[in-house]
Curated annotation (Swiss-Prot):
Positions with biased composition (Basic and acidic residues): 1079-1091, 1118-1134
Ranges where the record places region Tropomodulin-like: 507-601
Sequence positions bearing Phosphothreonine: T1145
In-chain residues carrying the UniProt-annotated modification Phosphoserine: S1008, S1134, S1203, S1281
Superkingdom of origin organism: Eukaryota
Complex formation: Forms homodimers. Interacts (via C-terminus) with heterodimeric capping protein (CP); the interaction inhibits CP activity and hence promotes actin polymerization at the barbed end of actin filaments.
Localisation: Cytoplasm; Cytoplasm, Cytoskeleton; Cell membrane; Cell projection, Lamellipodium
Modified residues (Omega-N-methylarginine): R1191
Protein name, UniProt field: Capping protein, Arp2/3 and myosin-I linker protein 2
Length: 1296
């Protein structure tokens, strides 16, 4: 919700949001009515398409509401800030505002909403006086231009439709939205078809049509075979009178009557900016008065003389009756216009009057004239034939002339053919003279003049009752050198069978004539029966016939079998139509099997009548035949389909969708930056805004030009001339190939005859050879056609490639301009942003860390990403190391940097630094180890050797309740959390595994805590464990200790806590041992065996010395012992349950796995080396010597452990496992930001419930925190202080 300068309480905003739900208010303004004053204020809630005036008192109620489409005008006033609305529903609405800024926000919001619905509207029409010119100028500068707004799909159709639904109170139909977004926009379709939404009500259709009135995307509105209601008709009339982008209006068979046409005529007569190019009103009930009004409107408005190219008024009987002969539509047709398509079939028009009007009007531009089922003349006169001859003499581009069913008299037919003979400028004309009742007289006229009519290429003479005159008529047609397509159906009503056979033989001879240009023949609906076999047999040797229509001749199964034989050898036919021939399933199967060997037939419309009849008797066989026919036709058309679709669809998919999306997103981004920059950005800012607007305008123009380029790439220029030249050239190539094949065949036969004379005398082999030769004879016929297809495919690919390259370059330039504009806007925004100074660094106190050390912690420990990348490249180049080993080496280098930086900071530290500061500096150097926390309840410090025994043991951590120490609330509040990056990088150092000996089926010992222990193989953890002390018995509850769960179901598998770690790694001094006292042994029964091996004293001493910070001299023996120890660790960790995901991490020394010794101040060194530290060293040395003599150690291989340095120094501590973040298990959910440690479970374990808890206690001290205050040292037994089940010392969480 947008913020306003007015103060509106959050409670009131929430109430308004709930009141308007599910609608959302985009702007809330505080206002009041002038007569009531500011004391009784209101809230003006501006939604997307509607405004609500609400009372501020609760409960809310609406004072008034209005749609933005109701706003007829607005008047703005600055002093006082006031707006006056002129609405349809209200006489006048005056509102006052507290400031001018709120008034400008209101004006901008309403103007932007109206602009989306009416894209061509301007601010000057909306804002009227007394609006100040300065305010209007500011609104124009802040209001985005029409070209700079990234348009929604299909020119904002959905926004307009939504606004109209809100205006009329109708529901918004999501199906219309889906169709517009998915079909129309994605496919670039600008044709809005009302038939797609015919299942909606009339009001929904009316709203969708009303949304087209001001839409700039759709160019065509069509409705076919659907009756239109009155509401839809009204909106169509409104759209016709308003839209200047509507180019095609098709209303066919919609039940329209004369009153609709009269009102349509009024709308067209007054719309001088109309872009209508096509008007189709066929199949309606239009009367002569409506047609007269339409003709006058077209003649009155001079715009249609240069725009209207397509007019279809067919199927309206009586619309052009006798009353129209003197005017009406003929007035418009007699004017010079650009009509190219005119269809007046079935309108009772007089052809004589029509040709007279056309001769003085559009005869030069007319290409298609359909005047079928009309009257040639209402009286016998010579004027009509003369008008026809004049029209044919003046036409230049006519390609179709339909006069079917017009009952032409002989003189009219003679005038027609003579006019075509005299006009040498037209060619490839299709003349339809079917059902004209020409009979013998017309046949004689055709025989005399058809040879001279060179413009004719297609002639339809069906159903003219020629009868026996067909003999001479066929001979006359054969003499024509221009006729390529002839239709002679329904003319074979000859009683004499010999005459019929003579006609059919002449037609067959015409088909087989090499000099005859005939390519298509139709004898449909002639009932030839067995006579059709004469024509079918002629198909075996026809040289040029490519299309044959023998439907409706009742040829039966015998004729189908003959057709199948002809198709096996014919390679010229491309189309065969043979429906309504009484063919059964066997006949269909014969044709299907023949098509398996025919690779040239492209089209065979499914014979639906015969298939329906055959399916009733033998459905399985019929289905099989139909599928086989369709598969063969698909195979024959596969090459053409891929060559046609691939170059057309590929550019559209790769360029249009992606580029449009990218441009729209970038335009939106630039628009947002422009709004952020605002108007008061100074002169440089205004220049940047203007440049951004120009860039958006250019980008939108580049998207609008893409469809034009694609259409230009698809439509080849000079296609007809190029095709003619290629056909003539490829015809010569075909002749040469045919001659070559014939010569090759003859040579092959001669050679075979000379080599195998006896084999040629075998009848079967000779017949087989002839079949092979006949099959190969069609190859020369297919070669020119394939070459022609390949030539056009390659030309189309080249055109589309050029178009795509040009389109990509245009879009690239537009995108570059948008990027540059956005960069300039961002630069201006950064210059306007206030400069904030960093706070001064405070002086450091005695116990404070340096800001450099605390703030640059990651830079201190870890290299930058660029340095790591360079090191990776160098390592890979030197050793060819795989990536999994390379990551291990990089981890080792990181640890090396850690120790190097730690040594550097340790050597550079002053000796007189207080202990707390020294500890903080060491923490920074080695990764920030917080002071060890005291255990809960008993006040004892955690042992340093805590956790090693189960680190190498075979058991897994499974319990849900973990034991954790309590923190002091004061300390917890001042703690600083570990940086997240540090915890991430330190989290992959360890891998927890179980020994190989623990694999296999689990015994019942795991589920029964009281079971007897069994012997097991000793591990390195056993070797490092301190020797058992006499007198310390094992308690039954020691296995679980403080970590036992009250739920028995959760004890199916034992789990260790960190308390057991505290007694395994480092030996404590005698004083601390005494303070600790006797403790219950935390080892489980399965881990305490009688056969435990004695731990290595050297290892224990080495570990202890490393924990207290004493460095050791380097030597060969030390290196060997270290390698041996690392090998033991690797061996112990090779097989385990809990594995780390980063297996390439190198093994880390045990030093990194331990806690700090103690947080007690008594254990810390004081200044000057005085304090409890000296006693600790003395006691520890006595204990080591006594234990060494008691065990009887001999001479060692290398130098023994070095004596501790006499100078007191703080013990070096390593990061505690609490802060070492392990790789998180994806099964455990997201990592807790305050608890970095998370053990990864074995994949064999079942999924445990996710544990969530407050931050781990180990994170209680940050880098800059002070040492914890001393806790009481009085021990308390675990029985008196039970552990809290809500926390886990290892980073667990509460029990869910």
């Amino acid at each position: 919700m947008a913020q306003t300068p007015d103060d509106i309480s959050c409670e009131l905003r929430g109430e308004i949001t709930r009141f308007l739900w599910p609608k959302e208010a985009e702007l809330l303004l505080k206002t009041w009515l002038p007569q009531e004053g500011a004391e009784q204020s209101h809230i003006l809630a501006l939604l997307r398409w509607r405004a609500y005036l609400l009372h501020t008192c609760l409960p809310l109620r609406v004072d008034c509401t209005f749609s933005y489409l109701e706003v007829q005008a607005m008047a703005l006033q600055e002093t006082p800030p006031r707006v006056t609305f002129e609405l349809e529903s209200l006489p006048e609405l005056v509102l006052e505002f507290p400031c001018v800024a709120a008034l400008e926000q209101l004006a901008q919001h309403v103007a932007a909403a109206i602009k989306k619905v009416f894209p061509r509207s301007t601010l000057g029409k909306l804002f009227r006086k007394p609006t100040p010119s300065s305010l209007l100028a500011r609104l124009e500068r802040s209001h985005p231009l029409e070209s700079t707004i990234p348009s929604s799909p299909c020119g904002g159709f959905l926004e307009t439709y939504e606004a109209l639904c809100d205006y009329n109170g109708f529901p918004f139909r999501e199906e219309i939205q889906w169709d517009v977004d998915t079909i129309y926009h994605r496919q670039g379709c600008r044709h809005f078809c009302l038939g797609d939404f015919s299942h909606f009500g009339s009001r929904d259709l009316a709203l969708s049509v009303a949304a087209l009135s001001y839409n700039l995307w759709f160019r065509r509105l069509s409705c076919e075979d659907m009756k239109l209601s009155l509401e839809v008709s009204e909106q169509i009339l409104h759209m016709t009178s308003q839209s200047s982008y509507l180019e095609e209006l098709v209303l066919e068979a919609c039940g329209l009557r004369g009153d609709f046409v009269r009102r349509l005529a009024q709308a067209l007569a007054g719309h001088f900016n109309s872009g209508l190019r096509e008007l189709s009103l066929s199949g309606n009930l239009l009367d002569d008065r409506g047609m007269r009004a339409l003709g006058r409107a077209l003649a009155t408005n001079a715009t249609f003389d240069s725009t209207l190219t397509h007019l279809d008024l067919s199927g309206n009987p009586g619309a052009l009756g006798p009353s129209q002969d003197s005017g009406g539509l003929y007035t418009f047709l007699s004017r010079p216009n650009v009509l190219a398509y005119l269809n007046l079939a079935g309108t009772d028009a007089t052809l004589g009057t029509l040709f007279t009007a056309l001769a003085g009007g559009c005869c030069s531009s007319l290409t298609h004239l359909e005047a079928s089922r009309n009257i040639f003349s209402r009286m016998k006169s010579q004027a009509a034939p003369a008008a026809l001859q004049r029209f044919l003499g003046g036409t230049r581009m006519l390609r179709h002339l339909g006069l079917a069913g017009c009952k032409l008299p002989p003189e009219a037919l003679r005038a027609l053919l003579e006019g075509l003979a005299l006009n040498t400028q037209i060619h490839d004309l299709h003349l339809d003279l079917s059902a004209c009742e020409l009979r013998s007289v017309g046949a004689q006229v055709i025989q005399d003049l058809v040879c001279d009519a060179g413009a004719l290429s297609s002639l339809d003479l069906s159903d003219n009752g020629f009868g026996s005159d067909m003999v001479t008529l066929v001979l006359a047609i054969g003499r024509s050198r221009s006729l390529k397509h002839v239709a002679l159906g329904r003319n074979f009503n000859v009683r004499c069978k010999e005459t019929l056979d003579d006609v059919l033989h002449r037609i067959a001879q015409l088909m087989q004539d090499d000099d005859c240009p005939l390519q298509s023949l139709s004898v449909a609906e002639s009932r030839l029966k067995q006579g059709a076999s004469i024509l079918i047999r002629a198909l075996g040797t026809n040289p040029k016939l490519t299309a044959l229509d023998i439907s409706g001749n009742a040829i039966g199964d015998a004729g189908a079998k003959m057709l199948a034989k002809a198709l096996r050898v014919n390679t010229r036919l491309r189309s065969v139509i043979w429906d309504r021939n009484n063919t059964s399933a066997l006949g269909l199967l014969d044709v299907a099997q023949a098509l398996e060997q025919n690779h040239s037939l492209k089209s065979m419309p499914l014979p639906l009548n015969d298939v329906t009849q055959a399916h009733r008797s033998r459905p399985e066989l019929t289905t099989r035949a139909v599928h086989q026919i369709q598969a063969c036709l698909w195979r024959n058309n596969q090459v053409d389909s891929t060559s046609d679709l691939k170059p057309c669809l590929q550019p559209l998919g790769l360029i249009s969708d992606h580029s449009e999306q990218e441009v729209n997103e970038l335009c939106q981004s630039v628009q947002e930056h422009m709004e952020l920059l605002g108007c008061g950005a100074g002169p440089q800012g205004e220049v940047a805004v203007h440049q951004a607007e120009d860039a958006i305008q250019n980008a939108n123009f580049s998207l609008s030009i893409l469809p034009i380029l694609y259409e230009a790439g698809r439509s080849p220029s000079h296609h007809w001339q190029l095709q003619q030249k290629l056909e003539s050239l490829l015809g010569q190539v075909g002749e040469i190939c045919r001659q070559d094949i014939q010569d090759f065949t003859q040579t092959t036969l001669d050679t075979t005859r000379s080599l195998c004379p006896q084999m040629l005398q075998t009848p079967g082999w000779r017949k087989q050879l002839e079949g092979v030769l006949v099959g190969s004879g069609g190859l020369p016929e297919l070669l020119p056609e394939h070459l022609l297809q390949d030539a056009f495919s390659r030309l189309r690919d080249m055109r589309l490639s050029i178009t795509g390259t040009l389109a990509e370059s245009i879009v690239a330039q537009a995108l570059a301009g948008l990027h540059a504009a956005r960069d300039r806007l961002v630069e201006r925004l950064t210059q306007q942003a206030p400069v904030t100074m960093a706070p001064a660094v405070p002086p450091l106190g005695g116990n404070e860390l340096s800001p450099l050390e605390t703030g640059g912690l990651e830079e201190l420990f870890f290299p930058t990403e660029k340095e790591e990348e360079r090191e990776k490249v160098l390592l890979r180049k030197r050793n060819g190391t795989p990536s999994w080993q390379l990551r291990g080496k990089m981890q080792s280098r990181r640890l090396g940097r850690l120790h190097a930086v730690a040594e550097k900071h340790w050597a550079a530290g002053p000796r007189d630094t207080p202990a707390s500061a020294v500890y903080q500096r060491v923490d920074v150097c080695v990764g920030w180890v917080p002071p060890a926390l005291l255990q809960e309840g008993n006040g004892l410090t955690a042992r340093v050797d805590e956790g090693v025994e189960e680190f190498f043991s075979k058991r897994l951590i499974q319990q849900d309740h973990f034991w954790a120490p309590e923190e002091d609330p004061a300390t917890e509040g001042g703690a600083t959390p570990v940086p997240r990056t540090l915890r991430k990088k330190l989290g992959t150092l360890f891998a927890f595994k179980k020994p190989r000996s623990t694999r296999g089926p689990r015994p019942d010992l795991e589920t029964s805590p009281g079971a007897a222990a069994r012997a097991r193989k000793s591990t390195l953890g056993d070797l490092l464990r301190p020797p058992a002390r006499p007198g310390r018995g094992e308690e039954p509850g020691g296995a679980e200790g403080g970590t036992s769960s009250p739920d028995p179901a959760r004890r199916n598998r034992p789990r260790y806590t960190r308390e057991s770690k505290a007694y395994s790694m480092i030996l404590l001094p005698a004083e601390e041992e005494a303070a600790v006292g006797t403790r219950p042994d935390k080892r489980r029964p399965l881990e305490r065996g009688d056969t435990e091996l004695a731990p290595s004293f050297e290892q224990r001493v080495q570990v202890m010395l490393q924990r207290i910070g004493v460095s050791r001299a380097s030597g060969g023996a030390e290196s060997k012992r270290k390698q041996s120890k690392d090998g033991e660790i690797k061996k112990a960790g090779s097989d385990g349950d809990i594995m780390d995901s980063s297996t390439e991490t190198p093994p880390i020394s045990i030093k990194s796995r331990t806690h700090s010794v103690s947080a007690d101040p008594s254990c810390r060194p004081g200044p000057g080396g005085q304090g409890p530290e000296s006693a600790t060293w003395k006691t520890l040395g006595q204990q080591l010597n006594a234990e060494l003599r008691g065990r009887g150690w001999g001479q060692q291989d290398g130098p023994g452990p070095p004596s501790p340095c006499p100078s007191p120094s703080p013990r070096r501590t390593s990061p505690a496992p609490d802060i070492l973040s392990l790789p998180e298990d994806p099964c455990l959910g997201p990592r807790n930001e305050e608890r970095p440690l998370r053990l990864q479970r074995s994949p064999v374990l079942k999924r445990r419930p996710k544990l969530e808890a407050p931050p781990s206690p180990s994170l209680g001290s940050g880098l800059g925190s002070k040492p914890l205050p001393p806790y009481p040292t009085e021990p308390s037994s675990p029985e008196r202080s039970p552990p809290s089940p809500a926390t886990d010392q290892r980073g667990g969480g509460p029990n869910p």
